[in-house]
Amino acid sequence: VETGKVKFVFRDFPLDRLALAAAMMARCAPKERYFPVVDIIFGTQQNWAKVADPAAALSQIGLLAGISKETYQACVSNKEVFDGVMKIRNDGDKKYKVQSTPTFVVNEKRIDGHLPIERFRKVLDAELAKAKKK
């Protein structure tokens, strides 16, 4: 990515209502804070996803990211934000038949699951080698 040889595109693919709320919350952050919020969501997922009231815990995570409880509530109730996240999810499902997360798409080829970095690097290196030959 840093060399400009690879482009990374992150797309939300919520598999349940809680993941949907998290994706919606990130979308409601200011544009320049989107990826820092996503990092906080994923980095603290074990802390909020498996508690008795995960929605309240997610709201607390929002506070860490600078999203007030009022903004969080308005965001997760916003039909436009909901429709936007679901469109991205549904497009990924239709085009790539995504069934789980994480899923990566490299040159239109779907790669399912969490790969060790060495294996993922091999996939990327092979695709970069193909691109050089063109």
Predicted region positions:
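C-terminal cap of thioredoxin/glutaredoxin-like
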Residues: Q60-K134
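Structural alpha/beta surface segment adjacent to cysteine/selenocysteine redox centers
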Residues: V1-L63
